Structures are given as C-alpha cells and as structure tokens.
C-alpha cells in the first residue's frame, strides 16, 4: 500500500496522508480549507513497515481504507509553567 504525504501550508507539523497523488476527493472541503495548499512531502510504501515516525501505522492504514485520508496533527504543547508549579507543590 502506497500513501502520499502532504505538509500543511497553514499549520506547522500537520500532515495529510492520501492514497493517490493529488487526489483529495475523499477529504472534506472544510478540512482542506483549514489545511491550506497541500505541499508534497513524500511518497511512502506502508508495506512491510511496522511503524512510522510520528503516527500509528495501523491507524493510518485503517483511515486510508475507511475514510480515504489520515490527518496527522502535532502533539499538544506542554504547559511548562503548569508543570513547574505542580512540581513545586510536591
């Protein structure tokens, strides 16, 4: 299974995985608007892979099969002040 990965032009560290190059027919229009102009990042074979760098490969495969796309968003930012204050209370 091949997938094509696009980088968002509007959102840092946000990627859209689709099955075919430049085929966004199954991606909701509102998502594409907020994603911005997709910038090709890479074409990747999922066959024989056990993991991906920043996404669960099984979730990616399932989403591609069921929905036709997978959206990878960055992890939430740590609130370092909150963490620091919490550590001080211990």
Swiss-Prot record:
InterPro entries: YcgL-like_sf (IPR038068), YcgL_dom (IPR027354). It comes from the Bacteria. Coiled coil: none annotated. It holds the Pfam family YcgL. Gene3D superfamilies: YcgL domain. Residues 1-85 form the YcgL domain. HAMAP family: UPF0745 (MF_01866). PANTHER family: PROTEIN YCGL (PTHR38109:SF1). This is YcgL domain-containing protein Spro_2755. It comes from Serratia proteamaculans (strain 568).
């Amino acid at each position: 299974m091949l997938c094509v990965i696009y980088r968002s032009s509007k959102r840092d560290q946000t990627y859209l995985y689709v099955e075919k190059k430049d085929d966004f027919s199954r991606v909701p229009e509102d998502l594409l608007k907020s994603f911005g102009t997709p910038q090709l990042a890479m074409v990747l074979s999922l066959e024989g892979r056990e993991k991906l760098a920043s996404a669960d490969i099984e979730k990616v495969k399932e989403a591609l099969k069921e929905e036709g796309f997978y959206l990878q968003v960055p992890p939430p930012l740590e609130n370092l002040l909150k963490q620091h204050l919490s550590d001080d209370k211990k």
